Amino acid sequence: MERRIHLMQLPREVLLGENLTGEVVSVAKRIGLTGKALVIYGPKTKEIAGRDVEDAIKSAYEVSSLTIRKGATMEEVERTIEKIKDEGIGWVIAVGGGSIIDVAKLSSFKTGVPFISFPTTASHDGIASANASIKDLGSKTSVKAVPPVAVIADVKVIKTAPYRYLAAGVGDTISNLTAVRDWQLAHRIKGEYYSEYAASLSLMSAKMVMRNADIIRLGNEESVRKVIKALISTGVAMSIAGSSRPASGAEHLFSHALDMLLDKPALHGEQTGLGTIIMAYLHGMKWERVRETLKRVGAPTNAYELGIDPEVIIEALTIAHTIRPERYTILGKDGLTREAAEKAAKITGVI
């Protein structure tokens, strides 16, 4: 008889509050992290919180640091791995947005060293998930790695990021609605594994931001808390599922297609938000509710607001199905025709 083993790796601690830089050491101690620490940040996030985190850790651990300048690329991942190995690093803490966290995630996975996520924005659900989005050879791919052993979300730090990032976090969370529909479709048509538990948690996160859209729009600390909670529980849903299925469907393929077609893509969550409006229409869902929520939080709902040529939107819709052919979605095996793509984008007001 075949043994069915399903591994769920989850963060052991999630800390949400204010002025948490001083808490890093106690979290590390509680989890039992030992050895030299490596703090990873970007040039901006070093100033926002990176240096403070580094100083806080110095009181109890030997510390090294690394500035990521090129975003989430394989080159930066290799550079981080090299530093971890050369300096005998015992644990890593990533202070930054999605790119910095993704670099830490893949580096720690490849070296077997635990990492803590210290997000400086609430713009996407990678802050607590096991999946890393890495740019390599021109295109972005989602790579399975490990989730952080802890997430330390300081609402005061996150609130300093431009409001646009918070609105993007809503876009990434609301995409769970169509992602779960795609997952259910793949389960019915392809017999793919489906977890009711993971799907429910993912949908709950999306519904939570929809219900609290007006509070989120205020852009205060309570707004940050609402979005961060939704993003973290989405990350946990992915860990429970053992894949990004609960939070990534055709709307994410559309966003990846835009990444490939544009020299300067918009924020990930802004693109997935737009994709969710269109995919909700294709699924026969109440797409107007998705658009309404995005409008209420001040997120873009059309190509014009994102500064994207309508032609690019149509092209992205027609090539989206080729990005992860093994991932069955509403786009099917053959994708959308140009006519169908244009019609869907026009009906939903995206173009």
Curated annotation (Swiss-Prot):
Cofactor note: Binds 1 zinc ion per subunit.
Associated pathway: Membrane lipid metabolism; glycerophospholipid metabolism
UniProt binding sites for substrate: 125, 172, 256
UniProt-listed InterPro entries: G1P_dehydrogenase_arc (IPR023002), G1PDH (IPR032837), Glycerol_DH (IPR016205)
Bridged cysteine pairs (disulfide): none
One Pfam short name: Fe-ADH_2
EC number in record: 1.1.1.261
Single annotated GO MF: glycerol-1-phosphate dehydrogenase (NADP+) activity
One of the GO BP terms on file: glycerophospholipid metabolic process
Annotated family: Belongs to the glycerol-1-phosphate dehydrogenase family.
The protein's role, per its UniProt record: Catalyzes the NAD(P)H-dependent reduction of dihydroxyacetonephosphate (DHAP or glycerone phosphate) to glycerol 1-phosphate (G1P). The G1P thus generated is used as the glycerophosphate backbone of phospholipids in the cellular membranes of Archaea.
Protein name: Glycerol-1-phosphate dehydrogenase [NAD(P)+]
Source lineage: Archaea, Methanobacteriati, Methanobacteriota, Thermococci, Thermococcales
